[in-house]
Amino acid sequence: MRHSKRTHCPDWDSRESWGHESYRGSHKRKRRSHSSTQENRHCKPHHQFKESDCHYLEARSLNERDYRDRRYVDEYRNDYCEGYVPRHYHRDIESGYRIHCSKSSVRSRRSSPKRKRNRHCSSHQSRSKSHRRKRSRSIEDDEEGHLICQSGDVLRARYEIVDTLGEGAFGKVVECIDHGMDGMHVAVKIVKNVGRYREAARSEIQVLEHLNSTDPNSVFRCVQMLEWFDHHGHVCIVFELLGLSTYDFIKENSFLPFQIDHIRQMAYQICQSINFLHHNKLTHTDLKPENILFVKSDYVVKYNSKMKRDERTLKNTDIKVVDFGSATYDDEHHSTLVSTRHYRAPEVILALGWSQPCDVWSIGCILIEYYLGFTVFQTHDSKEHLAMMERILGPIPQHMIQKTRKRKYFHHNQLDWDEHSSAGRYVRRRCKPLKEFMLCHDEEHEKLFDLVRRMLEYDPTQRITLDEALQHPFFDLLKKK
């Protein structure tokens, strides 16, 4: 039995994930924080809609204005970007990866056979906390443990650094030319030479080795780890180079939502990928738009005369799932707190225990965000989060309330929530029953919302499984094609 104990990282709710920037080859971005007030004003997004999409365009315009009024980027998600220092640059073809700058939890040195560590990875003791640590004339770390490197440096006599894609609390990600593979460009995650980050990286490596060996051709769309090595105490993981994250595409498209046909294609791939994890007795635990990356994020731009603006439309909706550092096997120790706030399932908030269904809840949240351009659970407070759920999905089931240890959220088996408080008014103003978020009431939109509603079932035992989701009528058009 696996019982690798995880230590809770103090910045759990303020973490960025390893996936989104870490594999990205092109578009360095300004960090999402209180100090960041610009929203890529230079971007010229594209979308193309048919008349049958009803009032999609008008509703999207209203959603966009409402969304910006909420200062979503600066106020609702900035805490997931602490330590992230991206920079903007442009190239002919956009591609992207995500930085995972702090792990939700780190496994201890006890591990199962599946996670048996590779013997060739040398172990390094904790190093002194000097302002600048030097091991040799050419190998230096800064005061935080980041490897000091620059364009032109070569790792392992093979990977020539082209540029830094981003930095985070965990380390940095660089784009490299792989001289051992005919000059192919790759993304290399260079983890800080700090014990907890090395352990987190090795944990991710073990999961990736398992998944990549089980699915060597990436049929199930988990990011491919090409290799890993130790560079003077820094764990370095080499990944394929991918495109923008789905979150960044939305952001750079002025938070316009995806077309429903694209949502269908992306949703099917996500369900297939995470179902593959579930069949391998794994739960991802940190699914969100930042951790879903496009293989190529190329797009076409067209002018929308109705909205009087340029909009972007994807050329290819192929995706990969990234960030397996928090993935947990069924028989491992399960940390009490998992998932990024906006995508956290009710059983996690209520400390009722969790397993694979928490991933399904996260996917439901992701799909509604793809549809609207913003997340419906915009909060950092657990009680407010539960109030939003009740406003959107109806009352929390009594049996879940009675079982939870989180009694502080309830009074007489009802959510202890004042609808007339400022927070109560905020929730009432911003949230509404799920179906009222529909932008069009044609059959395909109805099918999507039926799928989302089944994914957002409170009781994890009643929540749709991904095997069942893949058979949902929303995906019938894909099967016909």
UniProtKB/Swiss-Prot annotation:
Residue ranges constituting the Protein kinase domain according to the UniProt record: 159-475
Activity control, per UniProt: TG003 inhibits its kinase activity and affects the regulation of alternative splicing mediated by phosphorylation of SR proteins.
Residue positions of the active site: 286 (proton acceptor)
Biased composition annotated in UniProt, kind: Basic and acidic residues: 8-24
Residues binding ATP: 165-173, 189
Biased segments, Basic residues type: 25-34, 106-136
Chain spans, region Disordered: 1-46, 102-143
Subcellular location: Nucleus
Protein family (similarity comment): Belongs to the protein kinase superfamily. CMGC Ser/Thr protein kinase family. Lammer subfamily.
Pfam family, one: Pkinase
E.C. designation(s): 2.7.12.1
Domain of life: Eukaryota
InterPro entries, alphabetized: CLK_kinases (IPR051175), Kinase-like_dom_sf (IPR011009), Prot_kinase_dom (IPR000719), Protein_kinase_ATP_BS (IPR017441), Ser/Thr_kinase_AS (IPR008271)
Swiss-Prot/TrEMBL GO biological process terms: regulation of RNA splicing
Role, per record: Dual specificity kinase acting on both serine/threonine and tyrosine-containing substrates. Phosphorylates serine- and arginine-rich (SR) proteins of the spliceosomal complex and may be a constituent of a network of regulatory mechanisms that enable SR proteins to control RNA splicing. Phosphorylates SRSF1 and SRSF3. Required for the regulation of alternative splicing of MAPT/TAU. Regulates the alternative splicing of tissue factor (F3) pre-mRNA in endothelial cells.
Chief place of localization: nucleus
Gene Ontology MF term list: ATP binding; protein serine kinase activity; protein serine/threonine kinase activity; protein serine/threonine/tyrosine kinase activity; protein tyrosine kinase activity
Protein name per UniProt: Dual specificity protein kinase CLK4
